[in-house]
C-alpha cells in the first residue's frame, strides 16, 4: 500500500476497500502497509515525499495515528497485516515496530469483532469457508513479502516460480514487493487420495 506516501492512490484504495466492505470480504495486506521512508536515519528519505499532515517532529507517530483514524471504516474487515521491507527497515534503524504499534492502537481504539492479526515477513494463512451448515472447506495461502528487484521484462515472475517450486501444500503463493500486479496459474501433476494421477491448479 505505502499508505503514507504521496504517490499512494488513496481514491483507488478507498474504492477497493469500500467494495470489500460491500461484499463482506476480509482485507489482508502482505507487507509495506506503510512507506515511512522520510525519517531521519533513512538514506532513501526525501522530505518532498511526505504528506503535509505527517511532516512533524514525531513523524512516525503522526503516520501511525493518522492511519488508525483513516482505516476505521474497515475495522471489521481488516484482519491480517504482514511485514514488508519498509516496516522491517524502521525496526532495524529506529528500534521501534510500526506495525505492532498500529495493530495494538487500532485494536484498542476500534475494538473490531475480529482483532487484526499481525503476521510475519512470510508465513501461512488458512482461510476456512462454510458453504452450508454441514460442509467446511479451506484454502491455504503461503505468503512472503518478497525481496530483490522485479526486472523490467520478467516483472518478478521468476521469484514467484522459485517460491512456488519450493512450497508444498499451498493453494496459493502470494508475494509482493516488486510493485507489479498479476495472477499466474500453475498446473501441477499430483496423485489424488486413490493414488490416481491428476492435474491440479
PLM feature segments, named:
Residues 2-3, 35, 148, 180:
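Short, glycine/acidic-enriched loop or turn micro-motifs at the edges of active sites
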Residues 3-119:
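Core catalytic region of metal-dependent phosphoesterases/phosphodiesterases
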Residues 19-23, 73-75, 135-136, 165-169, ...:
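Flexible, charged surface loops at secondary-structure boundaries
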Residues 83, 129, 143-147:
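Short, structured patches in soluble enzyme cores that scaffold and shape functional sites
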Residues 115-117, 128-136, 162-167:
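Short, conserved, surface-exposed binding loops centered on an aromatic residue
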Residues 122-126, 183-184:
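Short beta-strand scaffold segments in enzyme catalytic cores
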Residues 124-141, 200:
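Beta-strand-turn-beta hairpins that frame and shape the catalytic cleft
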Residues 138-201:
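Conserved beta-sheet core of the metallophosphoesterase superfamily
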Amino acid at each position: 500500500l505505502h499508505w503514507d506516501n504521496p504517490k499512494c492512490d488513496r481514491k483507488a484504495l478507498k474504492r477497493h476497500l469500500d467494495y470489500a466492505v460491500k461484499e463482506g470480504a476480509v482485507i489482508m495486506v502482505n507487507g509495506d502497509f506503510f512507506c515511512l521512508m522520510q525519517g531521519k536515519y533513512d538514506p532513501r528519505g526525501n522530505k518532498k515525499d511526505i504528506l503535509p499532515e505527517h511532516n512533524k517532529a514525531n513523524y512516525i507517530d503522526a503516520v501511525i495515528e493518522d492511519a488508525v483514524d483513516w482505516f476505521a471504516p474497515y475495522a471489521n474487515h481488516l484482519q491480517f497485516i504482514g511485514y514488508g521491507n519498509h516496516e522491517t527497515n524502521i525496526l532495524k534503524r529506529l528500534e521501534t515496530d510500526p506495525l505492532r504499534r498500529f495493530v495494538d492502537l487500532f485494536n484498542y481504539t476500534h475494538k473490531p469483532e475480529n482483532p487484526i492479526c499481525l503476521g510475519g515477513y512470510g508465513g501461512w494463512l488458512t482461510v476456512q469457508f462454510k458453504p452450508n451448515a454441514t460442509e467446511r472447506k479451506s484454502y491455504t495461502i503461503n505468503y512472503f513479502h518478497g525481496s530483490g528487484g522485479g526486472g523490467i521484462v520478467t516483472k518478478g515472475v521468476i521469484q514467484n516460480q522459485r517460491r512456488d517450486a519450493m512450497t508444498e501444500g499451498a493453494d496459493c503463493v502470494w508475494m509482493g514487493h516488486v510493485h507489479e500486479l498479476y495472477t499466474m496459474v500453475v498446473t501441477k501433476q499430483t496423485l489424488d487420495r486413490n493414488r490416481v494421477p491428476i492435474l491440479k491448479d
